[in-house]
Every structure is written in structure tokens, then in C-alpha cells.
């Protein structure tokens, strides 16, 4: 408690208030001084404490101070009144702001001038009281107050808040015409709201106009635009603006600019550009805050450059900075994703020691351990959570159960599920989906079906992941009828089939040669508003080709090309293989020739398939021409390519020709497999 001298002056109180950094403590000190015998606050002291209350949103105390000023008849200038009106405006209290404005002479002993009018006008804008804004602006003329640049800036702000951007642009044009030269605030207000509304091209156009008219943009203008373009993943335009900023001698990037660039570019996958900016910051000794480090670490971890991320993290640690849990979690996730389990556990110990752990940290570590096959370690962390004061959430359950299932521990996952439910916990649909999918893959369909019923009892709604797992399980068990029935019943159970659901079933039907039923489900897809995707067509095409129904396959191919979907090399290869299997080599060559027109490049599978096809019809010359094409296109043959040509040459020309390619393979560092030796041995035996 501060002990005041008997004779207390406002100057002494002001000094004490300025030295007190805690706003609440400062206000308590102000209150104590108010009660001191023979003491009265000065206008300067009132102004100081009102500003402090504004900063900390201690707005409930403002009215008491205003009443104190009035009762003590302390004559104040307009600045004191403005601080009150601003505070009320900032806290969405326009009625209180208006009351103070009307009583300025009574309370503060001063008349409202243009600044007071503008501040009240802004309070109405912040509260979105548009009618009062217009009424007050109309009152300017009655009161004999001439609007100034700041007045029009407030009106521009109102237009932007109302999304009336054309009106805001109109204000700017009118201001130039009438001699009110817009300033950087006028332009940045419109640019900011255009960017927030996603109208980045309009914002950039206004930014260019601003520069052309001689209004120098400040760093805030650059930050707004760069941030907007990076959020839209337009890193090219963002980099152009960055370069303009560096070339602009009147303004310099600040820590916020660097943070926007590093965070935004890393989200665009431009980590190399982030590192260039980082190095530039270090060379120029630019200020870096925790967010700068955290953003770069996050970007590097996402890009897989965990070693560099660790280096940046260590640099941050060496600064003795207070590292937050978000940054720790980012680094922990980076270590886990790249398999650095030792480093993950070392960092975990540090995090626990510094009490920088939350439930997200546990989720990251458990997931990382499970993804790297460390089941025992993950289980230990899971078991220790309650003792450490952390309760697992649905995400934790989902991660742990999914990880156990992926690693083949479905029984352990079932045990965890029972533990959770018996302790009053609840699993989400994704945890159930993991177990059901694993049970289906292990052909434990009855257990999977029972678990679906359990989900319903616990109020967990089915989703497509669960249903798709069951459909897949039924198909693997050759229960196609049940799979078809289940898909059609999905909608009745509150889960609409997706394209993936149909693709799983169509694939199973095609493998069983049931093309009529598969086609019926394609028709049903269309009727239910789903369009077959690339995978749907690939499944159908593969099934038809495998069943040597090439005419139907070609009909489907032309239907696919007319659908507007983009094809890929795999689909071309399916058709080429099908054509080769029935000896239609010329048609297969035509399909390959047309690949280039569809922005598709033939790969090794394409060439290997064609070579095999030509050898099967005894055309070794064209098969070897294909080999030449392969080299011409810059492809390096693999062991399958060598096996194909050696087998073909053994059949058509003899072992001696095949041995030339055998030697060539070894010269290129490609070593024979068992299949290679079988080809050569059979050729020698059959010679």
C-alpha cells in the first residue's frame, strides 16, 4: 500500500500512476489519492487514468470518474472528453458516448469541436448505428462544424462495414475533386475491407491508384494485401508485393510483415522462400518474435525438413524465450512424422519438466508412436495420462484405437473400447470405424455387424466410413448380395452412400464378372445425384478388359472421354493392356499416341505392356521399336522391362539375343530376379 505525504500534489500522483504498470493497481492508487484530505485531481491526472481504463477495458469505472470530474468542477480540455467518448465507442456503448458528448460543457467545461464530432461519429459506426451516423453528419451543418478529412474517413469506414465498396470508392473520388486529399488511412480502410471480402484484385487496383496519386502506402497496407493473397494461395502476387515493399524506400517491413510472409508462404508450400526471408531477417538483424519462429518451424516440419526446423527451434531455445505449448507441439509433431522417436521422447521430457503439455501434445505423441510401431510406448503414455492429470478426449480415443488397429492389434483396440465405455467415456464414429474396418479385413463380419448395433445404442450415427468398411468386408467374403442390399439400405439408416461406397461395390461386382449388376449401380449412382468419377470408370474398364469384353470396354472409354473427366496414365494402361490381350495392337498404339493430346505421358508400364503384346503376336521387330521409343522418351527400363524383352526374344529369336539385354541390365545396375533366371533356363531347355 502506498503511503502518501500529507501535502499531496497532482504531479506526485501522476508520477506514481505512470510508474505502476498494472492497470488495476493504478486505478486503486487513483482511488486512494481521491480520498486523500485536501487533495483534488488535475485534468492531466484524469486524462491519464481514463486512457489506462480504455486500454484495459475497465470501462465500468469510467462513469464514476466522469461524475467525479463534474462534481469537482475540474476544467478539462477536449482531449479528456475525447478519451471518454473513445472508450465508450471502443466498447460498443454509443448511447453513453452520446450522453457525454451532449454534456461536455457541463462535465468538462469545454465545447465539442470537430474532433469530438468525429469521435462520436466513429462510435456510431463501430456500433453499426447507421441512422445515427447520418443524423449526426447532417447535424454538422446546423452546428456550424465543417467536416474535415477524418470525418470523411469515418464515412468511408461506414461504407466498407456495410460492404458498399462502390460508395467508398465514390467518397475517395469526391474527396480528390473537392480538395480533401485522402490520406493513407482513407485508402487502407477500403483496401482492408476489400481484402477481407475476398475482392483482392479490387484492393490491389486501389493500392496502385493510391501510389499513382502520390499517397505513400504504409506497411499496414502492404501487410493487408500480402496476407490476403497468401490466404488465397496466390504466392506469386504476394511475392511481387513483397519485392515492391523492399524497393519502397519510404517504408520498411515490420515483424508483422515477416510473420505474414513466413506463415503464409509455408502454408503455400514455399519453404525455400520462407528460409530466404528468414536469412534476410538475420542479416539485417530484424526483430523476430515467438510467432516468427513458430511459423517457420511449422512450415519446415510440414515440408519434411525437420533437421532445419530443429535448428530454428534450438535457436529459439537459446534465446531463453518463453516457448509456448503450440510451438512445442509443432516440433513434437515434426519429430513424430519423420520417425525421430528418440528425439520426440527427449522433447517430451522437456515439455513435461516445463509444464508445457496439453491434451493435443498427448494426441500428437501417441499418434506418432503408433505410426512408428511403438505400441508399448504409446500404451504407456496412454496409461499415464490420468496420473498426470489429463483426461483423454474423443480425439485421443480415436487416435489410440486407430493406431492399434492399423498395427494389427484389433483385440487390444476392442479392450480399450470396453475400458472407455465402462468408465463412462464415449467414442466417436471414427474410433468405431477403425475397429469395424479392421474386423472386416480380418473377416470377422459378425463382430463388425454387432459393433454397428452397439454404435446405435450409444447414440453414434453411422457414417460412410463405417458403411464402406462393411460393404468391403462383405465383398471380400463373397457375399455380394448382402453387400448390394446393405448399400441400398444405407439411406434408411441415415447414411447416404457416397461415390466411394458405389466404387467398392462396383469393383466387387466387376471382379465377379457381374457387369450387368455393376452397370445397374452406375445408373443408380446417377439417379441419386452422384457422378461416376475416374475410379468408377477405371474399375469398370478394368473388369471389362479382364473379361475380354473389349468392344464394351471401348464403348465405355468413349463414354468416359465425353464425360469431361480428366483421364490418367493408369486408365490408359488398363485399356492398352486389354487391347493387347486380344491382339488389337494397332488400336493399342493409337490409344498411346493420343495420350499426349490428353496431357498424359506414357510410363514404363505402358511400354512394357505394348512390348509384351507385340511379342505375343510374334512381332519382335515392333517390340524392339517400342524399346527404342522408351529410351527416346528418357525412361530407364526396369527389371520388368528387361524380363519382358528377354522372354520375347527367347520365344522369337533365341537365347543369344536375350543375353545381350541380360548383360545390358547388369551394366545398368539392374540385377536379375528368380523370374529372369526362369526365362533363360526355360529357353535353354526348350532350344
Curated annotation (Swiss-Prot):
PROSITE patterns: PPR
PPR repeat spans: 42-76, 77-107, 113-147, 148-182, 183-217, 218-253, 254-288, 289-323, 324-358, 359-392, 393-427, 428-462, 463-497, 498-532, 533-567, 568-602, 603-637, 638-672
Keywords noted in UniProt: Repeat
Pfam entry (one): PPR
Record-linked InterPro entries: Pentatricopeptide_rpt, PROP1-like_PPR_dom, TPR-like_helical_dom_sf
SUPFAM superfamilies reported for this sequence: HCP-like (SSF81901)
PANTHER family membership: OS03G0856100 PROTEIN, PENTACOTRIPEPTIDE-REPEAT REGION OF PRORP DOMAIN-CONTAINING PROTEIN
Family to which this protein belongs: Belongs to the PPR family. P subfamily.
UniProt protein name: Pentatricopeptide repeat-containing protein At3g09060
Amino acid at each position: 500500500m502506498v503511503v502518501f505525504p500529507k501535502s499531496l500534489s497532482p504531479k506526485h500522483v501522476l508520477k506514481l500512476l505512470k510508474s505502476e504498470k498494472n492497470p488495476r493497481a493504478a486505478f486503486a492508487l487513483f482511488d486512494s489519492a481521491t480520498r486523500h484530505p485536501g487533495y483534488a485531481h488535475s485534468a492531466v491526472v484524469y486524462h491519464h487514468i481514463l486512457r489506462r481504463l480504455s486500454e484495459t477495458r475497465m470501462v465500468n469505472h469510467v462513469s464514476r470518474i466522469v461524475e467525479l470530474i463534474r462534481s469537482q468542477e475540474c476544467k478539462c480540455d477536449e482531449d479528456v472528453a475525447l478519451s471518454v467518448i473513445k472508450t465508450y465507442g471502443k466498447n460498443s456503448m454509443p448511447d453513453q458516448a452520446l450522453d457525454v458528448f451532449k454534456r461536455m460543457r457541463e462535465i468538462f467545461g469545454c465545447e465539442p469541436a470537430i474532433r469530438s464530432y468525429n469521435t462520436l461519429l466513429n462510435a456510431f459506426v463501430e456500433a453499426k448505428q447507421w441512422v445515427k451516423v447520418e443524423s449526426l453528419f447532417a447535424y454538422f451543418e446546423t452546428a456550424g462544424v465543417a467536416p474535415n478529412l477524418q470525418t470523411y474517413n469515418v464515412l468511408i469506414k461506414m461504407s466498407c462495414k456495410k460492404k458498399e465498396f462502390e460508395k467508398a470508392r465514390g467518397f475517395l473520388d469526391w474527396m480528390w475533386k473537392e480538395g480533401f486529399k485522402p490520406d493513407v488511412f482513407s485508402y487502407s480502410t477500403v483496401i482492408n475491407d476489400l481484402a477481407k471480402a475476398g475482392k483482392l484484385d479490387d484492393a490491389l487496383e486501389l493500392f496502385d491508384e493510391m501510389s499513382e496519386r502520390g499517397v505513400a502506402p504504409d506497411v499496414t497496407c502492404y501487410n493487408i494485401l500480402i496476407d490476403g493473397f497468401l490466404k488465397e494461395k496466390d504466392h506469386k502476387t504476394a511475392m511481387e508485393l513483397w519485392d515492391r515493399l523492399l524497393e519502397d524506400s519510404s517504408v520498411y517491413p515490420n515483424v508483422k510483415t515477416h510473420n505474414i510472409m513466413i506463415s503464409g508462404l509455408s502454408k503455400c508450400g514455399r519453404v525455400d522462400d520462407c528460409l530466404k526471408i528468414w536469412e534476410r531477417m538475420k542479416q539485417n538483424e530484424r526483430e523476430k518474435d515467438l510467432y516468427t519462429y513458430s511459423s517457420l518451424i511449422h512450415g519446415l516440419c510440414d515440408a519434411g525438413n525437420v533437421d532445419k526446423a530443429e535448428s530454428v527451434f534450438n535457436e529459439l531455445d537459446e534465446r531463453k524465450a518463453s516457448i509456448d505449448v503450440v510451438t512445442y507441439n509443432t516440433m513434437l509433431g515434426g519429430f513424430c512424422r519423420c520417425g525421430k522417436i528418440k528425439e520426440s521422447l527427449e522433447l517430451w521430457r522437456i515439455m513435461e519438466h516445463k509444464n508445457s503439455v496439453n491434451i493435443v501434445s498427448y494426441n500428437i505423441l501417441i499418434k506418432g508412436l503408433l505410426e512408428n510401431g511403438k505400441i508399448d510406448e504409446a500404451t504407456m503414455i496412454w496409461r499415464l495420462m490420468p496420473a498426470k492429470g489429463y483426461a483423454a478426449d474423443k480425439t485421443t480415443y480415436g487416435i489410440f484405437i486407430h493406431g492399434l488397429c492399423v498395427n494389427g492389434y484389433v483385440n487390444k483396440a476392442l479392450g480399450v473400447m470396453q475400458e472407455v465405455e465402462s468408465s463412462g467415456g464415449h467414442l466417436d464414429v471414427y474410433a468405431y470405424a477403425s475397429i469395424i474396418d479392421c474386423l472386416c479385413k480380418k473377416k470377422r463380419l459378425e463382430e463388425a455387424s454387432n459393433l454397428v448395433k452397439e454404435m446405435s445404442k450409444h447414440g453414434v450415427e453411422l457414417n460412410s466410413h463405417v458403411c464402406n468398411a462393411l460393404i468391403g468386408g462383405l465383398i471380400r467374403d463373397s457375399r455380394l448380395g448382402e453387400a448390394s442390399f446393405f448399400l441400398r439400405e444405407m439411406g434408411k439408416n441415415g447414411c447416404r452412400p457416397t461415390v466411394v461406397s458405389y466404387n467398392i461395390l462396383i469393383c466387387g461386382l466387376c471382379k465377379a464378372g457381374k457387369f450387368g449388376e455393376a452397370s445397374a449401380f452406375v445408373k443408380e449412382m446417377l439417379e441419386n445425384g452422384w457422378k461416376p468419377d475416374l475410379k468408377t470408370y477405371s474399375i469398370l474398364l478394368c473388369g471389362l478388359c479382364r473379361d475380354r469384353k473389349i468392344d464394351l470396354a471401348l464403348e465405355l472409354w468413349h463414354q468416359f472421354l465425353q464425360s469431361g473427366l480428366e483421364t490418367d496414365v493408369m486408365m490408359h494402361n488398363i485399356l492398352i493392356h486389354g487391347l493387347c490381350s486380344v491382339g488389337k495392337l494397332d488400336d493399342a498404339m493409337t490409344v498411346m499416341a493420343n495420350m499426349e493430346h490428353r496431357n498424359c505421358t506414357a510410363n514404363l508400364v505402358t511400354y512394357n505392356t505394348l512390348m509384351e503384346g507385340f511379342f505375343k503376336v510374334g512381332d519382335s521387330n515392333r517390340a524392339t521399336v517400342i524399346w527404342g521409343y522408351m529410351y527416346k522418351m528418357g525412361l530407364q527400363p526396369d527389371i520388368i522391362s528387361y524380363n519382358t524383352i528377354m522372354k520375347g526374344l527367347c520365344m522369337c529369336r533365341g537365347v543369344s539375343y536375350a543375353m545381350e539385354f541380360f548383360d545390358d541390365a547388369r551394366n545398368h545396375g539392374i540385377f536379375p530376379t528368380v523370374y529372369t533366371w526362369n526365362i533363360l533356363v526355360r529357353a535353354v531347355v526348350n532350344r
